[in-house]
Design a protein with these regions (language model features):
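Anionic-ligand anchoring segments at beta-strand to alpha-helix junctions in alpha/beta enzyme folds, i.e.
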Residues: 1-53
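A structured phosphate/pyrophosphate-recognition subdomain
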Residues: 1, 8-15, 19, 90-191
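Short, solvent-exposed polar/charged micro-motifs at secondary-structure junctions
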Residues: 33, 56-60, 177-178
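General beta-strand structural signal in soluble alpha/beta enzymes
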Residues: 23-25, 61, 82-83, 122-124
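Residues at the C-termini of beta-strands that transition into short coil/loop
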Residues: 27, 84, 103
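Hydrophobic/aromatic residues located in beta-strands of well-ordered beta-sheets
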Residues: 21-23, 80, 130
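Short secondary-structure capping/turn micro-motifs that flank functional sites
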Residues: 30-31, 54-55, 131, 173
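Active-site cofactor/cluster-binding pocket
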Residues: 39, 43-97
Length: 191
């Protein structure tokens, strides 16, 4: 959820400057929360295998870094921008613009600060998504939440659609989830 929300926020910042921005991802959107976020934000996502990276002037990574294995960016492609809250990885050091704040609990906090600095009031869908990014990555503010995360949480909670937040957090799970859960429980052994 943090990455989806951050991608939407970065797109909002780019669009504010009249810069076209596509959100590209590597595979399927699997988690029910991410599917709900994409739907709620009305995001058009493009799969990496459906675009030519050469057609972009710049590439940004949010909530991930090059060489970490959790993003689809080919190793021979260097992003221009990396914004993340995880500890810095060596390949990130050569990127032109980096904002790595490993003391933060969520990258959504960083993007919230960017929106505030640009004097952009996030619309309720974006505020809701960023709020959920913080909630998700900090496990309801119980894991690694810092002052900046708390400030962003309170700022966004005043602008978010709380009913939609609840629907995103507790959305329906697909039928295969229950089949897999049944299989796992049926095969579980106590030692």
């Amino acid at each position: 959820p943090d990455a989806v929300a951050c991608a939407a926020a970065l797109r909002r910042l780019a669009n504010n400057r009249k810069i076209p921005c596509w959100i590209v991802h590597g595979g399927m959107v699997g988690r029910s929360e991410n599917r709900a976020l994409v739907k709620y934000l009305d995001l058009t996502l493009r799969r990496l295998d459906e675009v030519s990276l050469d057609s972009f002037d710049r590439i940004a990574l949010v909530d991930t870094q090059p060489g970490t294995g959790n993003n689809p960016l080919p190793e021979d492609v260097e992003p221009a921008i990396v914004i993340d809250h995880h500890p810095i990885h060596k390949p990130t050091r050569s990127v032109g613009f980096t904002d790595i704040r490993s003391s933060y609990g969520a990258t959504a906090t960083i993007l919230c600060e960017y929106l505030q600095a640009a004097d952009i009031e996030p619309e309720p869908p974006l505020a809701t998504a960023l709020l959920y990014g913080i909630i998700s990555d900090t496990q309801d503010l119980g894991r690694r939440a810092r002052k900046a995360d708390l400030e962003a949480y309170f700022y966004l909670s005043q602008r978010a659609n709380m009913r939609m937040l609840s629907e995103i957090q507790h959305g329906p799970l697909p039928k295969p989830y229950y089949r897999h859960l049944y299989t796992a429980l049926d095969n579980a052994r106590i030692f």
